[in-house]
Amino acid sequence: MVVSQIPKAAGFMYALVMIGVIAYLWYSGRWRQKLGWLLLVISAFLGFLIFSPVAPWQFQQLVLRDVQGLGAPLIVGVIGLFVVLVLTFIFGRFFCGYLCPVGTVQEIASHAPVPKVNLRQKKMFMVIRAGFFIVFLLMAFLLSASFLAYFGIRDFFYLVLTAGTVVFIGVLVLSMTFYRPFCRLVCPYAVLLSLGAWKGLFKLQRTDACIECKKCENACPTDEAKRGDGKAECYLCGRCTDICPVAGALKYDRVGGRT
């Protein structure tokens, strides 16, 4: 289904514009979950239509210096991925949450009405992902090999049935019970974006209106809702704000801003 005539840069332009739009809507209090669902569907569709902005894969092709696989000149790829990283540092992980097709199909799957497994092992998951990141770099620089090919990302969105496609379908099935397994355990680009979000300028924060009911902590699938959490693994999914019983107790704002 992927239309090769449409430049992959179009997907990144969509993402860069929408990061700013989503951040504004969150900041102004105008964000609605219905809009979130619309973006999830659009972004997933773009994955199948133009295979962009599939940042994990394009980041890998950039490291491999594979211009053909990247779908754009190397300098364009560098600029695009760097700008996404900068915007994540400013606004948080809206790209991962609503715009990357790999993330959006997992997010959609996570809403399946089945029992959830919510392991409070955030640091361990980040260590596992860092280990995969090292493997990713070793395979790229020493073997010029595609680490992500084993997870079938490209084959899945190109609608090609391979062993890798089956693996990625398995990831989606797992996503129904365990939130975003690829993003949290495997994605090499997420290593960089999580660092950006951890030091980010804007985050979801509790205000003085919080009554410490801990409903947000119980609802958060990545264990990032406690006071003092760095929000490195916060995908702005909205589960915490949806369940919060006090208006204004959770706000998306500049760090050190409105309370």
Which stretches of residues belong to each language-model region?
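Non-ligating segments of multi-cofactor redox enzymes
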Residues: 1-223, 233, 241-259
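Short linker/helix segments within small regulatory modules
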Residues: 227-237
